[in-house]
Amino acid sequence: QWFYKPGGGALFDLGCYNFTSLCGFLGPVKRVTALVGTAIKERIVDGEMTQVEVDDNAHVLLDFGNEVYGSVTTGFTIQKYGHAPAIELFGLSGSMNMLGDDWAPRGFERWRNEANCWELFEETDPNWPWADGLNHLIDCIHADTPTVTRPEHAYHVLEVMLAAQESSRLGRAVDIESDFPAPQYPVLAAADSRRLHDPS
């Protein structure tokens, strides 16, 4: 029942992964506007009727600055979702779709205007275990190197989620104060992909 008490809720249980990924791709958020609420006020948990005291439904708009925007929809109100991309990124010269979920990645698709087709990048480690982040942490401690996702990044995501709740309460945008150094990723070559037929 603690899941539906203060400290729990959809933003902190589910949304945290989406915010962490989007901030990893696009950098720190500057401002948040959100609608956050409780659609299902009571739930049966462990055979008992439980009052839901936290959010179970949220739509969050993120302003990354420089006219770069994102949105996250999350909630315990979504019964099942299809095989649509988990994360979509749209830019001036193309688009990218993350396939699968953060915890079960299936690679990604990339559209580049110059290639004029979708390119599929298969998951590089399809047997990647969910707990492998712990191995990464241990490797970084042994090598005295920083982790890919830094503590500042996690703190920033926490501030974004709290700001989403505040924005919904106040009915206005909320500025974000924290910052973090954006992660650096290797550049992928088209040779690492295979082309897909685009029926459109």
State the predicted function of each range:
Residues Q1-Q51, G171:
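Predominantly a Rossmann-like dinucleotide-binding segment in NAD(P)-dependent oxidoreductases
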Residues D139-S200:
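C-terminal helix-rich "cap/oligomerization" subdomain common to oxidoreductases
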